[in-house]
Amino acid sequence: MRLLNNLILMVVLFVAVSNATTKFTFNTFSVRNTEDQTCFTKTAKTTDDSTKVDINKCTVGCGGSMKIRKGTKSQQYQFELFSSTDCTGETTSKVLFVCPNPSIDAISIKSTSNTIKCGTLPPDSEIKEDDTATAVVNDENNNETKNEPKTKTKSTPKSPSTPKTNNSNEDSDLTTSSSDSSSSTKSSPKSKSSTEVNENKPKSDNETAEGNNASSNIATFSLVIISLLVASLF
């Protein structure tokens, strides 16, 4: 009877460990634009957020920029691309990817050395963020960096398209998809008669990936439990 109870306990522990959600944290990673210039770097053991973005290097197209927003509660970096479609101030925005995303179905963005796992948002999905998220956008008049509380830009577009926002808890679970991990938009210079929109995947470098090795800790804990159960049988 005692052996049966121990076996049941081991099965319960195994199921609990198998269903545990792995959350990814990133000590250091950087984002490069289509011209292979580093425009954002998150350094280990610092509080770097979107205020550290080199917005001039992230600029794409005509009057556009990449925007990186970090939620202090959810600790998620949301990468967006703001580009002017006709160089007149009319802007469009598109969510590229969210990193890190505590979703089991997170996709992998491979770099030269390591792999970082981020979640992508479907086009029609909502961005779950907290009230304290910060935004950095490119000022088209004087190229200065500004902080804004949400995802809206200060321009008055004819038909703006901004992601929906709402409040979320600390661990927001965003729906992921395996397509379009990142995209960038380019606009032709003024000398051309029309603008061209190209969607490319910006490179992402990650020097140190998963900061907390949840898998190894769970495996160690399971071995200790099994050893104690086996020892109790003798």
From Swiss-Prot:
Disulfide bonds: none annotated. One of its GO terms (molecular function) is actin binding. One of its GO terms (cellular component) is plasma membrane. Coiled coil: none annotated. A lipid is attached at residue 212 (GPI-like-anchor amidated asparagine). It is found in: Cell membrane. Residues 115-213 are annotated as: Disordered. Residues 213-234 form a propeptide. It is a lipid-anchor; GPI-anchor. Keywords: Actin-binding, Cell membrane, Glycoprotein, GPI-anchor, Lipoprotein, Membrane, Signal. The GPI-like-anchor contains a phosphoceramide group, rather than a phosphatidyl group. Belongs to the ponticulin family. Binds F-actin and nucleates actin assembly. This is Ponticulin-like protein J. It comes from Dictyostelium discoideum (Social amoeba).
